[in-house]
Amino acid sequence: MIFITLEHILAHISFSLISVVTLAYWGTLVHQIEGLSSSGGKGMIVTFVCTTGLLITRWLYSGHLPLSNLYESFMFLSWSSSVIHIILEVRSQKDRGLGAITAPSTMLTHGFATSGLPKEMQQSAMLVPALQSHWLMMHVSMILLSYATLLCGSLSSIAFLIITFRRNRRILSLLSARDNSFIWPFPSRNNLYLHEQEKSDLQNTFYLSFTNHRKCKLTQQLDYWSYRVIGLGFLLLTIGILSGAVWANEAWGSRWSWDPKETWALITWIIFAIYLHTRVNKGWQDENPAIIASLGSFIVWICYLGVDLLGIGLHSYGWLI
């Protein structure tokens, strides 16, 4: 009873903290307050500690690694996102753009686990005999870590596409406005108005140049880290699939059975393999790999939740709805 109460307290504290942290990172994108960004980083560390304590507490009273149902997998996914956030904070020298992506991911997965799932699915239960294996920790943890990593990299690619599209559209609209302007050679009231319009366009050009420099730097950082994070996620997914094949061979005598989860895991692996191939292909650069990564985020969610929506297969946690 004490462990269950402690788990609920840690769940509420961690969700409250990550909600405040998300608002802090979004605020830094608008106002660029350095202290706010630093507070967000510290808040994420406290969130990580609370979520770690929650998982350890559940491990102690359940007697097994908390990866046996949908609630536990979502909490582990949220924990993984916080780990990725902290690593990126250190490696990217506290870049605000990345924090504004990883913090909401942590908040949404945590919130869905605690508030979106029915209480029956949040209860801990004994493991079925097939799951009572040392491969549970290796296989499931690697798969969930890969999901969190691939989603983080894919969301960075989506943000890269959005910023690039809006920047290009603004440049085209300004150039179109300037090309359509015509200065009448004789002095008139309209002529003075057009000169004022040209002056305004010039001011907009300077402002656009400044903002484009910031956006260009941000898109470069998003593209840089998206590539590296997805590369790590691809490696983790490969390890997870291989360890699952070994476990399946020990449990059922078959390494691959084309279970729905296995099939979608293979599709996910192929999509991100194509993404990594396009990154080394000079003919496919800029937005093209980002589009593939964006598709990959959709595929990851199908792989993760699709089986539960169908309610079939050996990997199903049961009906989600």
UniProtKB/Swiss-Prot annotation:
Pfam families: Cytochrom_C_asm. Keywords: Chloroplast, Cytochrome c-type biogenesis, Membrane, Plastid, Thylakoid, Transmembrane, Transmembrane helix. The chain crosses the membrane at residues 1-21, 36-56, 70-90, 97-117, 143-163, 229-249, 256-276, 290-310. It is found in: Plastid, Chloroplast thylakoid membrane. One of its GO terms (cellular component) is plasma membrane. GO terms for biological process: cytochrome complex assembly. GO terms for molecular function: heme binding. It is a multi-pass membrane protein. Coiled coil: none annotated. It comes from the Eukaryota. The keyword Thylakoid applies. Its main location: plastid. The keyword Plastid applies. Required during biogenesis of c-type cytochromes (cytochrome c6 and cytochrome f) at the step of heme attachment. Belongs to the CcmF/CycK/Ccl1/NrfE/CcsA family. May interact with Ccs1. HAMAP family: CytC_CcsA (MF_01391). This is Cytochrome c biogenesis protein CcsA. It comes from Cycas taitungensis (Prince sago).
